[in-house]
């Protein structure tokens, strides 16, 4: 589980409910239980840090979850959400930080067994998103927003339809249909990777996700999309270029560490408590928190 010895003696006061694994996840029952326990432990420590600092988690709003049934409803929902969160129809900054600013607890874990992300609720109060730390920049952003879709979209469809709606939601959050059409124009016959790389670099969305969106909007034909998939499958050099991330490091969050640091600076917790919350040794804690001055 990658936890300290102290973990086994901690009292767990937080119960995890309504955790829905991403359909793409290939976690078996043992791995799923291990992930659930890591989530349980992290959320407990997260809430303890919140309590120590007096910070409140903002509510995501009474308008969510929302019932949607088709593509048009998803586009409308994303516009409404961006307006409510005051993020506009522009390239999104750090997606994880945006989610945390609006009441979502985001947890990153180390797992290499086909797990991308999951979402759910803690005690039916706090929405959570769990991400595989090893995902690259574009994949982590898309997965985080896909899981946000699971939180904000009412479950009134079968699993396959929900996955499709969440994929549409994530893509629309990263770059709206209107914005993409403004950039690329109308229907085209050919696809030039250079142009898509520019959009990828500006909006933090993968080339594959862009091409899927272009097919859906009719910018490229279904046959052109299939031809691209075939070429990518057979051309290692193309595949490597398409799947190359625009950034060497994926997005992450420093909110939890910053909360513990603030609690420590307020003398709300001891150094040993800070180390326990962060699940690190005292030596690592001293290396992490180097005071510049004391009053």
Label every model-predicted segment.
Residues 1-295:
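Active-site hotspot residues in diverse enzymes, especially metal/ion-binding acidic/histidine motifs
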């Amino acid at each position: 589980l990658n936890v300290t010895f102290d973990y086994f003696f901690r009292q767990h006061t937080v119960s995890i409910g309504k955790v829905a694994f991403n359909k793409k996840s290939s976690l078996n029952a043992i791995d799923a239980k291990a992930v659930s326990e890591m989530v349980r432990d992290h959320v407990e420590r997260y809430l303890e840090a919140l309590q120590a600092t007096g910070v409140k988690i903002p509510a995501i709003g009474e308008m969510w979850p929302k019932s949607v049934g088709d593509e048009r409803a998803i586009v409308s929902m994303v516009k409404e959400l961006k307006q409510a969160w005051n993020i506009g129809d522009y390239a999104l900054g750090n997606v994880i930080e945006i989610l945390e600013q609006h009441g979502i607890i985001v947890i990153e874990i180390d797992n290499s067994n086909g797990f991308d992300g999951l979402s759910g609720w803690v005690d039916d109060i706090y929405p959570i998103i769990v991400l595989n730390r090893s995902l690259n920049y574009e994949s982590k952003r898309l997965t985080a927003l896909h899981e946000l879709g699971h939180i904000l979209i009412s479950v009134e469809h079968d699993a396959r339809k929900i996955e499709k709606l969440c994929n549409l939601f994530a893509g629309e959050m990263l770059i709206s249909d209107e914005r993409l059409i403004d950039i690329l124009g109308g229907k085209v016959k050919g696809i030039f990777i250079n142009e898509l790389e520019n959009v990828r670099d500006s909006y933090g969305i993968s080339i594959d996700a862009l091409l899927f969106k272009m097919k859906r909007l009719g910018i490229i034909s279904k046959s052109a999309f299939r031809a691209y998939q075939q070429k990518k499958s057979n051309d290692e050099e193309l595949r490597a270029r398409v799947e190359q991330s625009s950034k060497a490091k994926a997005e992450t969050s420093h909110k939890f560490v910053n909360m513990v640091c603030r609690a420590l600076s307020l003398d709300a917790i001891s150094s040993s408590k800070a180390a326990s919350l962060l699940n690190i040794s005292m030596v690592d804690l001293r290396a992490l928190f180097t005071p510049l001055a004391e009053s």
